[in-house]
């Protein structure tokens, strides 16, 4: 490889990273204009992706912007927001736990998600027929597991015992019927082990929710 080829490669790499930087700065600038705050298609999803980017590229100015985004999300939560995992409260709560447990953000999960938990515990899980990830039981289980794990790590307790017992009953019923998809069956089994106090870690996989 000659010097000219090497210089061309360096120029291409500089241009590529420049475009990448430009893209992420534009994302930050327009994030507050996003009409939704949720995980799949809103500000929380943007915040998590940017957080991973900050860690990979070590960009402190962007980290400050991420803190502003998270503050904006949490300050705009209200009781009329849906509990949906895709674009509602439980997805936002999952995002909060992601940021704390991955070391992106300081804070106490049970305090930051107190309003989310209160609304979720109003639901009679046994009467919920929607098993989907986006708007139903599967998504809620992701949040509940992440939240219970986060609380345990911080020596706190998430949710009332009666609610967790109800959650376990629902998971047992899902496994007993065996009609759910493989993802929900696996999730229900893991939920039962976690609620029994067994050492079964919940793993965060952002890529399965945000493409």
Model-derived features: positions:
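Glycan-recognition and catalytic cores of secretory/periplasmic carbohydrate-active enzymes
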Residues: 2-211
């Amino acid at each position: 490889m000659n010097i000219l080829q090497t210089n061309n490669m360096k120029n291409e790499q500089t241009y590529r990273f420049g475009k990448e930087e430009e893209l992420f700065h534009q994302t930050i600038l327009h994030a507050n204009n996003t009409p939704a705050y949720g995980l799949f298609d809103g500000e929380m999803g943007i915040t998590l992706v940017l957080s991973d980017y900050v860690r990979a590229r070590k960009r402190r100015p962007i980290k400050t912007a991420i803190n502003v985004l998270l503050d904006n999300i949490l300050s705009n939560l209200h009781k009329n927001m849906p509990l949906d995992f895709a674009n509602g409260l439980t997805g936002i709560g999952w995002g909060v736990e992601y940021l704390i447990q991955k070391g992106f953000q300081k804070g106490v999960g049970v305090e930051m998600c107190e309003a989310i938990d209160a609304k979720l515990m109003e639901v009679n899980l046994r009467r919920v027929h929607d098993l989907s990830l986006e708007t139903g039981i599967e998504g809620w289980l992701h949040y509940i597991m992440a939240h219970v794990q986060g609380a345990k790590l911080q020596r706190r307790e998430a949710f009332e015992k009666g609610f967790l017992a109800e959650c376990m009953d629902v998971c047992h019923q899902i496994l007993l019927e065996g009609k759910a998809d493989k993802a929900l069956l696996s999730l229900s089994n893991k939920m039962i082990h976690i609620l029994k106090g067994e050492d079964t870690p919940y793993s965060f996989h952002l890529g399965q929710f945000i493409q």
